[in-house]
C-alpha cells in the first residue's frame, strides 16, 4: 500500500501547459470541451462550463450550477469528488484533463475529511476500507477510542486546555538551573523586556523588568502591571486590587514567534528564556490578553467515521464464539509444511538449485535449530515437505515467529558452495487475538535488503508483501480440533507458582540438576557485587552462558536492582514455558525503571508484548514531553518491532501527539517520511489516519505544508531532469517564473514551518531565493517572518529544500549532538554546540535550517587570497575572526570558538563522523564553530583508491590551533591550548558516563534501513571510541592519544582540504 508517486500535475507531466483543453461530461449526457487556464479554480471552471452548456442541446434539463460538484479520476487511479471548489486545476493531480459533473450523495462532511486525510497521508483513505484483514479493521475501530479520549482531554477545561494543546509550553525537563548558567545572572535575577501593543496601528510600548529567574509568568505579568500603573499614583491597596483584577487576564508571548508561557513553570525553565540567559541576550516578551488568544483557537469537533459502526469481520473464534483450547495442553512438536513457490525469478545458468531455509525466532534469537527443505531445480520449485522443529508447541513464547527465505545454491568445482537469499518473509505464530496460526497460507516475500549477511531476516517485518508480483511461498500449519490460544495471565501465574514450588523441592546437590535453580537464599556479598556490575554494563557487552545462569538463579534478588531487567530478560530461555511463566510474574511486579533504560526494552531484542508493555508504562510514568520530543525519532522507529498494529506503544504515542500539537507535528512528519517504504506503509498509514482524524484544525495546517512540499518536489524534479543541462541563469529564470505563478504563490506562502511549527513562513522573498550548485539542485529559500514583533527575533526565515539526498542520517546525527549538548550543559560544560534544524519529509526529500551569519572554512580561506585558499596560510581564519570581532568582543569570540571546537572534536570522534573538509565545517561571525553534512558516520568514511581518505580521528588543524591560542606560533604550548584540552577531556568523560543511552538510541534505529546503520556491528564503533572495556583512567589515556594524533596529523587533513578546494574551484 505505497503512497502516491510524485509524477506532476498530470500523469507523467510535471507542469500543465498555461492553457489546457478540459473535457467536461454534463449530467444531460453532453460533453463540453473547455479551454482552461492551468491555475483556474473549480468554481471558475464550473461557471464557464454552465455558460457554455447553454449553447448545447438539452441544457434545460440542468439544475442550477450550485447543485453539482466535479468528479474525476486521479493519478492514484481513484475516483475523487471535488467538494472544495477553491482548488486549482493544476493541483487536482488528474490522470487526464477530464471532469464529470454530478449531484453529490452521501455524507458530505465525512467525504471532505477523508479527502483531506488522504492528501495528508499521501494515499486515499478508501484503500483501508478495501483491506479485508480483520486486524486492520479492528485496529481502525478500536484506536478511535484513544482519539476520543485525547480530544475529550483537550476540551477538559475549555479554552485553556485547547490553548495548551495548540501552544504547549516549550520547557526544559528540569526547573533546576545549571550552575554555570545561574552564574550568568545578577544575584539570581534576569532583565526582561515586556512589550505592549497600545493602538490598532500596532504602536508599541515597552517596560524593562528585573525579576527573579524562578518567577512564574503570572508574577512577571503582575510586575509589568505595577510598572505600567506607576504613573497613575495608586495607593498600595488600589495597586493590589488592580494587580489581582488584571493579572489573570493576560499571558506572555515570545516576540517573533508563536510561543506562549501558559503554565506556572519558573521563567528560567522556559527554553527561550534559558537560551537568552546562556547567550547573554535580553528576553523580549509580549503582553497580550488571554481572550485575544482564546478567541483565535479553533473549536475541534471529533465525529466517529461511518466505519466505526460496521460489524467486525473477525472469524467466530476471534470473537470467542467457538471452542478453544490452551496452547499448553497440546502435546506435540512444531512442524510446518512447505508446499511450493511462485514468481521466483532466477538466472538458471548461474544457479544450480533452490531451497527454503526456515527458523523459529524470538527477536533476533533462534528458539531451535534452523531447518532447510530439500534442494529442487529452480524451474520447478515444489517441495510438499513437512519440516520438524526441535521445540514443543507448549514451549512457544507469545512473540515467536517463523522466519523463511528462498535461497539459491551454487557449487563450483573444487570450491565451497555459495548460498544466497533470494527473498525473505516472516510470520507471527500467534495472531493479534492470541491464536496459534493453522491451515494453509500464501506469503508474498520481500526483496533482500542491502547489507543482509544472514540467510534469514528475523528482525524484519512480519506479514505478506502487498506487491503480489513478488516471490510467493505456499505453506501449511497443523490443524487442531479446537482453536489453540496462548494462555491468559491467571493460567501463567498458576504454572509459574507450580514451577517455583517444584524447583524448591529439589536438592541442589542432586547430580545433573541445572545450575539455573533459584538460589536467592544463599546470596553472598560478592554475588551482589557481581549482579551490580552486570547491571551497569553497556547494552552491547556480551553476557556469557555462565552469567545468564547466574542471573537467572538470582532472579528474585534482581528485583532489588531494577535496571538489571534487560540483562535478566536476555538470560531467560524463551523456549521454556517454565522460565517464561516465572519471568512474566516477575515483570508484572517489577519496579519502574528510568525512561532511558526502559527504551532499551523496545528494540528488536525484546519482542515480548508483556515486556514492551512494561517499558511503555515506565515511559508514561516518567517521560516528560520535552524528553519525548527528544527521543521521538527512535520511538517511531521501534513501532516496526511491534508484533501487531494495536499495541501500548502506538496508543501512548498517539495520545501524546493528540494532546501536544508540537509532538503531533513531528509525529506526523516522522511517519509520513516513511510512507514510500512498503514494509511499513500500511502500519504507518493507519496510524497517520487516526492522528489526522483527531488532530482538529491542525490537519489544515499540515495539508498546507504538504502542498508546499509537493510544489517544491515538482519544481526540483524539473530542474534535475528537464533543465539539468541549462545554465544557472536559465534555471534561475525558470525558478522565479514558476514561483510567481498564482498557484505557487498560494502554496508557498503563509504556512507553518515544518522545521518548527512555532515559526510562520510569510511572503517569499524571491530576490533572495536561489538554486544551489550541488548536483541535486537544492533550493535556498527565504521567507519573511509575518509576526508583528519579528524584528526582536528574526525578520526572515531561510531554509534549504533538498530533493535527492537522504537526510535521515543528518537528522539522527544532529539529534545525538543535541542530546550531547544537554548532557554537557547539565554537567556545567558550556560547549555551545549548534544542532541546526533538519527534517526528512519523504523519500530522499527534506529541509535544512540555514544558520544566520555563518561561512564555510573554505569561504573564509578564499577571502585570504590564493595562499589562504590553498591552505598555505594557517593564520587566515584567525585574522578573519579578528576583523569580525574587534576590541572587547575579540576574547569572547575566541572563547566561543574554543568551546564549540572542543564540543565538535569530541562529538565527531565518538560518532565516527567522516568526510570532513573545509566545505562542511562552518564558523559564525561571533566565532561559533559547527559542522554540517553528516553523510558518513560510525567510521564509514570516504575512500580513495580503496584507502580511507581521512587518517586522523577528528579535525584539529593548525588553523584551529592558531585561533585557540590567539595567534601564538607554538600553539600547543600555550595555556589556552591546555584549557581546550581540559574541555575535551571533561566532555569525553561526560558522554562516556551516558554510553548506554547513545547505544540504545542507535540500536532503536536499526530498523530504519540507513545504509551505514545496518547491524549491531556498526553500533559497536561507539563502544570502541568510548573505550567501554577499559577503566575511566584507561579510557581517558586512550582519548588523549587520539587527540595527540589529531593535532600532530593535522597536516594530512590540510592536504585533503587543498585537494577539495582545488576540486571545488574547478567545478565552479
Swiss-Prot record:
EC class of the enzyme, as a word: transferase
Mutagenesis / variant outcome for changing residue 1050 to D: Found in an endometrial carcinoma sample; uncertain significance
Domain PIK helical residues, every copy: 517-694
Consequence the record notes for mutating residue 1047 to Y: In MCAP; also found in an endometrial carcinoma sample
Region Activation loop, annotated ranges: 931-957
SMART domains per UniProt: PI3K_C2, PI3K_p85B, PI3K_rbd, PI3Ka, PI3Kc
Outcome (variant: residue 545 to A): In CWS5 and HCC; also found in a glioblastoma multiforme sample
Annotated PI3K-RBD domain residues: 187-289
Ranges for domain C2 PI3K-type: 330-487
One GO cellular component term: phosphatidylinositol 3-kinase complex, class IB
InterPro entries in UniProt: ARM-type_fold (IPR016024), C2_domain_sf (IPR035892), Kinase-like_dom_sf (IPR011009), PI3/4_kinase_cat_dom (IPR000403), PI3/4_kinase_cat_sf (IPR036940), PI3/4_kinase_CS (IPR018936), PI3K-type_C2_dom (IPR002420), PI3K_ABD (IPR003113)
E.C. designation(s): 2.7.1.137, 2.7.1.153, 2.7.11.1
Pfam families: PI3_PI4_kinase (PF00454), PI3K_C2 (PF00792), PI3K_p85B (PF02192), PI3K_rbd (PF00794), PI3Ka (PF00613)
Result for mutant: residue 542 to K: In CLOVE, KERSEB, CRC, BC, CLAPO, MADAC, CCM4 and HFMH; somatic mutation; also found in glioblastoma multiforme and endometrial carcinoma; somatic mutation; shows an increase in lipid kinase activity; oncogenic in vivo; occurs in the interface between the PI3K helical domain and the nSH2 (N-terminal SH2) region of the p85 regulatory subunit and may reduce the inhibitory effect of p85; requires interaction with RAS to induce cellular transformation; increased AKT and RPS6 phosphorylation in HFMH patient's cells
Catalytic activity as recorded in UniProt: a 1,2-diacyl-sn-glycero-3-phospho-(1D-myo-inositol-4,5-bisphosphate) + ATP = a 1,2-diacyl-sn-glycero-3-phospho-(1D-myo-inositol-3,4,5-trisphosphate) + ADP + H(+); a 1,2-diacyl-sn-glycero-3-phospho-(1D-myo-inositol) + ATP = a 1,2-diacyl-sn-glycero-3-phospho-(1D-myo-inositol-3-phosphate) + ADP + H(+); L-seryl-[protein] + ATP = O-phospho-L-seryl-[protein] + ADP + H(+); 1,2-dioctanoyl-sn-glycero-3-phospho-(1D-myo-inositol-4,5-bisphosphate) + ATP = 1,2-dioctanoyl-sn-glycero-3-phospho-(1D-myo-inositol-3,4,5-trisphosphate) + ADP + H(+)
Similarity-based family: Belongs to the PI3/PI4-kinase family.
Oligomeric form and interacting partners: Heterodimer of a catalytic subunit PIK3CA and a p85 regulatory subunit (PIK3R1, PIK3R2 or PIK3R3). Interacts with IRS1 in nuclear extracts. Interacts with RUFY3. Interacts with RASD2. Interacts with APPL1. Interacts with HRAS and KRAS. Interaction with HRAS/KRAS is required for PI3K pathway signaling and cell proliferation stimulated by EGF and FGF2. Interacts with FAM83B; activates the PI3K/AKT signaling cascade.
Protein name according to UniProt: Phosphatidylinositol 4,5-bisphosphate 3-kinase catalytic subunit alpha isoform
Amino acid at each position: 500500500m505505497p503512497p502516491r508517486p510524485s509524477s506532476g500535475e498530470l500523469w507523467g507531466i510535471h507542469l500543465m501547459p498555461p492553457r489546457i483543453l478540459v473535457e467536461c461530461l454534463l449530467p444531460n449526457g453532453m460533453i463540453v470541451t473547455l479551454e482552461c487556464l492551468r491555475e483556474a479554480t473549480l468554481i471558475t471552471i464550473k461557471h464557464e462550463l454552465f455558460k457554455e452548456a447553454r449553447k448545447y442541446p438539452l441544457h434545460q434539463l440542468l439544475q442550477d450550477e450550485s447543485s453539482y460538484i466535479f468528479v474525476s479520476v486521479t493519478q492514484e487511479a481513484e475516483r475523487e469528488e471535488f467538494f472544495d471548489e477553491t482548488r486549482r486545476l493544476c493541483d487536482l493531480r488528474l490522470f487526464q484533463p477530464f471532469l464529470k459533473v454530478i449531484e453529490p450523495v452521501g455524507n458530505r462532511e465525512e467525504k471532505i475529511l477523508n479527502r483531506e486525510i488522504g492528501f495528508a497521508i499521501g494515499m486515499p483513505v478508501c484503500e483501508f476500507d478495501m483491506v479485508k484483514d480483520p486486524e486492520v479493521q479492528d485496529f481502525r475501530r478500536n484506536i478511535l477510542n484513544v482519539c476520543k479520549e485525547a480530544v475529550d482531554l483537550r476540551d477538559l477545561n475549555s479554552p485553556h486546555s485547547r490553548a495548551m494543546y495548540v501552544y504547549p509550553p516549550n520547557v526544559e525537563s528540569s526547573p533546576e538551573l545549571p550552575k554555570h548558567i545561574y552564574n550568568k545572572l545578577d544575584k539570581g535575577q534576569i532583565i526582561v523586556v515586556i512589550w505592549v501593543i497600545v493602538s490598532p496601528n500596532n504602536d508599541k510600548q515597552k517596560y524593562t523588568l528585573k525579576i527573579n529567574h524562578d518567577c512564574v509568568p503570572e508574577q512577571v505579568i503582575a510586575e509589568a502591571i505595577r510598572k505600567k500603573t506607576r504613573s497613575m499614583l495608586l495607593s498600595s491597596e488600589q495597586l493590589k486590587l488592580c494587580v489581582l483584577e488584571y493579572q489573570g487576564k493576560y499571558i506572555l508571548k515570545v516576540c517573533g514567534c508563536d510561543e506562549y508561557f501558559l503554565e506556572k513553570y519558573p521563567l528560567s525553565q522556559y527554553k527561550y528564556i534559558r537560551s537568552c540567559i546562556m547567550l547573554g541576550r535580553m528576553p523580549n516578551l509580549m503582553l497580550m490578553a488571554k481572550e485575544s488568544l482564546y478567541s483565535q483557537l479553533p473549536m475541534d469537533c471529533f465525529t466517529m467515521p461511518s466505519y466505526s459502526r460496521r460489524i467486525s469481520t473477525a472469524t467466530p473464534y476471534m470473537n470467542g464464539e467457538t471452542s478453544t483450547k490452551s496452547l499448553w495442553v497440546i502435546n506435540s512438536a512444531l512442524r510446518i509444511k512447505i508446499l511450493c513457490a511462485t514468481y521466483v525469478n532466477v538466472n538458471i545458468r548461474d544457479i544450480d538449485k533452490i531451497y527454503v531455509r526456515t527458523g523459529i525466532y524470538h527477536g533476533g534469537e533462534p528458539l531451535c535449530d534452523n531447518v532447510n527443505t530439500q534442494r529442487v531445480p529452480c524451474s520447478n520449485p515444489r517441495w510438499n515437505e513437512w519440516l520438524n522443529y526441535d521445540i514443543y508447541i507448549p514451549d512457544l513464547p507469545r512473540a515467536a515467529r517463523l522466519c523463511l527465505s528462498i535461497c539459491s545454491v551454487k557449487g563450483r568445482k573444487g570450491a565451497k558452495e555459495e548460498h544466497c537469499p533470494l527473498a525473505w518473509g516472516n510470520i507471527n505464530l500467534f495472531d493479534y487475538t492470541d491464536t496459534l496460526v493453522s491451515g494453509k497460507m500464501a506469503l508474498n516475500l520481500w526483496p533482500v535488503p542491502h547489507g543482509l549477511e544472514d540467510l534469514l531476516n528475523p528482525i524484519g517485518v512480519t506479514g505478506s508483501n502487498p506487491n503480489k508480483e513478488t516471490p510467493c511461498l505456499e505453506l501449511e500449519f497443523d490443524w487442531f480440533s479446537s482453536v489453540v490460544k496462548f494462555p491468559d495471565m491467571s493460567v501463567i501465574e498458576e504454572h509459574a507458582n507450580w514451577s517455583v514450588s517444584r524447583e524448591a523441592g529439589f536438592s541442589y546437590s542432586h547430580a545433573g540438576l541445572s545450575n539455573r535453580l533459584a538460589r536467592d537464599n544463599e546470596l553472598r556479598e560478592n554475588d551482589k557485587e557481581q549482579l551490580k556490575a552486570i547491571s551497569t554494563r553497556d547494552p552491547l557487552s556480551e553476557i556469557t552462558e555462565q552469567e545468564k545462569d547466574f542471573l537467572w538463579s538470582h532472579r528474585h534478588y534482581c528485583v532489588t536492582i531494577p535496571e538489571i531487567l534487560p540483562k535478566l530478560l536476555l538470560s531467560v530461555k524463551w523456549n521454556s514455558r517454565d522460565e517464561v511463566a516465572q519471568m512474566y510474574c516477575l515483570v508484572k511486579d517489577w519496579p519502574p525503571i528510568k525512561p532511558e533504560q526502559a527504551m532499551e526494552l523496545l528494540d528488536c531484542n525484546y519482542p515480548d508484548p508483556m515486556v514492551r508493555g512494561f517499558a511503555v508504562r515506565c515511559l508514561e510514568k516518567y517521560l516528560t514531553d520535552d524528553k519525548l520530543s527528544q527521543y521521538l525519532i527512535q520511538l517511531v522507529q521501534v513501532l516496526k518491532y511491534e508484533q501487531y498494529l494495536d499495541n501500548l506503544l502506538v496508543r501512548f504515542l498517539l495520545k501524546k501527539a493528540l494532546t501536544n500539537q508540537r509532538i503531533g507535528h513531528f509525529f506526523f512528519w516522522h511517519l509520513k517520511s516513511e510512507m514510500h517504504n512498503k514494509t511499513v506503509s500500511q502500519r504507518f498509514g493507519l496510524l497517520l489516519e487516526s492522528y489526522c482524524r483527531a488532530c482538529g484544525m491542525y490537519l489544515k495546517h499540515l495539508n498546507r505544508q504538504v502542498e508546499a512540499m509537493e510544489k517544491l518536489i515538482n519544481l526540483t524534479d524539473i530542474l534535475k531532469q528537464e533543465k539539468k543541462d541549462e545554465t544557472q541563469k536559465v534555471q534561475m529564470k525558470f525558478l522565479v517564473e514558476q514561483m510567481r505563478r498564482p498557484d505557487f504563490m498560494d502554496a508557498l506562502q503563509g504556512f507553518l514551518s515544518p522545521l518548527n511549527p512555532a515559526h510562520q513562513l510569510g511572503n517569499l522573498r524571491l530576490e533572495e531565493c536561489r538554486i544551489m550548485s550541488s548536483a541535486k539542485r537544492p533550493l535556498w529559500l527565504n521567507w519573511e517572518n509575518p509576526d508583528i514583533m519579528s524584528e526582536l527575533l528574526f525578520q526572515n526565515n531561510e531554509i534549504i529544500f533538498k530533493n535527492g539526498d537522504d537526510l535521515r542520517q543528518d537528522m539522527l546525527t544532529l539529534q545525538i549532538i543535541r542530546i550531547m549538548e544537554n548532557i554537557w550543559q547539565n554537567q556545567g560544560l558550556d560547549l555551545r554546540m549548534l544542532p541546526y534544524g533538519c527534517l526528512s519529509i519523504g523519500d530522499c526529500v527534506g529541509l535544512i535550517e540555514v544558520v544566520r551569519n555563518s561561512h564555510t572554512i573554505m569561504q573564509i580561506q578564499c577571502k585570504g587570497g590564493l595562499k589562504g585558499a590553498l591552505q598555505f596560510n594557517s593564520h587566515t581564519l584567525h585574522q578573519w575572526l579578528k576583523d569580525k570581532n574587534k576590541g572587547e568582543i575579540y576574547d569572547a569570540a575566541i572563547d566561543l570558538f574554543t568551546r564549540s571546537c572542543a564540543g565538535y572534536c569530541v562529538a565527531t570522534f565518538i560518532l565516527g563522523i567522516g568526510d570532513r573538509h573545509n566545505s562542511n565545517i562552518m564558523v559564525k561571525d561571533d566565532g561559533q564553530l559547527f559542522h554540517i553534512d553528516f553523510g558518513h558516520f560510525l567510521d564509514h568514511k570516504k575512500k580513495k583508491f580503496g584507502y580511507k581518505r581521512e587518517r586522523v580521528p577528528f579535525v584539529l588543524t593548525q588553523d584551529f590551533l592558531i585561533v585557540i591560542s590567539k595567534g601564538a606560533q607554538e600553539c600547543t604550548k600555550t595555556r589556552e591550548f591546555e584549557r581546550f584540552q581540559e574541555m575535551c577531556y571533561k566532555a569525553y568523560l561526560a558522554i562516556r558516563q551516558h554510553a548506554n543511552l547513545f547505544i540504545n538510541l542507535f540500536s532503536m534505529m536499526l530498523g530504519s534501513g540507513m545504509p551505514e546503520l545496518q547491524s549491531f556491528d556498526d553500533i559497536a564503533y561507539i563502544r570502541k571510541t568510548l573505550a567501554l572495556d577499559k577503566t575511566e583512567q584507561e579510557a581517558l589515556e586512550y582519548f588523549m592519544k587520539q587527540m595527540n594524533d589529531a593535532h600532530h596529523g593535522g597536516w594530512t587533513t590540510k592536504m585533503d582540504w587543498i585537494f577539495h578546494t582545488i576540486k571545488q574551484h574547478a567545478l565552479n
